[in-house]
Amino acid sequence: MAVAPNALATWANAITAGRLVLSPIMFLVIPDHTRGSWIAFGLWFLLCLSDGIDGWLARKHGTTSSGAFLDPLADKVLVLGAMFTLVARDVFWLVPVAIIAGREVVISVYRTLVASKGVSIPASQTAKLKTLFQQLCVGFALWPWFADDRALWNTMLWIAVVLALVSGAQYLWWSRITSRALADAGVA
C-alpha cells in the first residue's frame, strides 16, 4: 500500500528513526582495541541491514519527504560516528575519515540547497557503492575474524575515499547542469 509523500509515520521512517536512536549505543560498544568485538560487529550488521530494509520498504510503499531527509541523515550519523569513534580508538587513521566527512558535508549542503528549490537529487550508484564500502570497512574492523587484517579494511576505507571523491565530483558536475536547468526554468 502506497503512503502519502508527506507521511511521517511509516515503517521505513520507524526503522530509520531506530537506526538514529541506536547509533550512539553503537559508538559506545566499539572496543578500544583492534581485536574486534562480536557485540559491536553484530549491532553494526543489524544497523546496516536496517538501512537496506528501510530502503526496500520506501521503494515498495513510496518515499516520503521526511524519509528522504531522515534516511541520509541516519546513514551519515551511523557511518561517520562509527568512523570517528574508530579514529578516537586509534583503529582508523584520521585523514581518510576526514576526507569522507568533508565530502559528506559539502554534498549534504549542496543537496539541501537544491532541495530548497524543489529539486530532489537521488543518491547515485557511485554514492551507494561508497556507502557500501564505508559500511564494509567499519564492519571488517569490528569483526573479530578480520579485525587484525588492517590491510583488508584499510583498503576498503581508501576505496570508500575514492568513491566519495568520485561521487562528490559527479554531484558537483550535475549541479552545473541542474543550475542551468533551474535558471532556464526561472527557478534559480
Residues covered by each model-derived region:
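C-terminal membrane-associated helical module and adjoining short loops/tails
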Residues: 1-13, 20-23, 39-48, 118-188
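Membrane-embedded alpha-helical bundles of polytopic integral membrane proteins
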Residues: 5-9, 17, 99-102, 106
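Core segments of transmembrane alpha-helices
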Residues: 18-26, 72-85, 107, 130-141
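Active-site His/Glu-centered metal-binding helix of metallohydrolases
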Residues: 21, 49-57, 73, 77, ...
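Membrane-interface helix caps of multi-pass small-molecule transporters
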Residues: 56-60, 113, 176
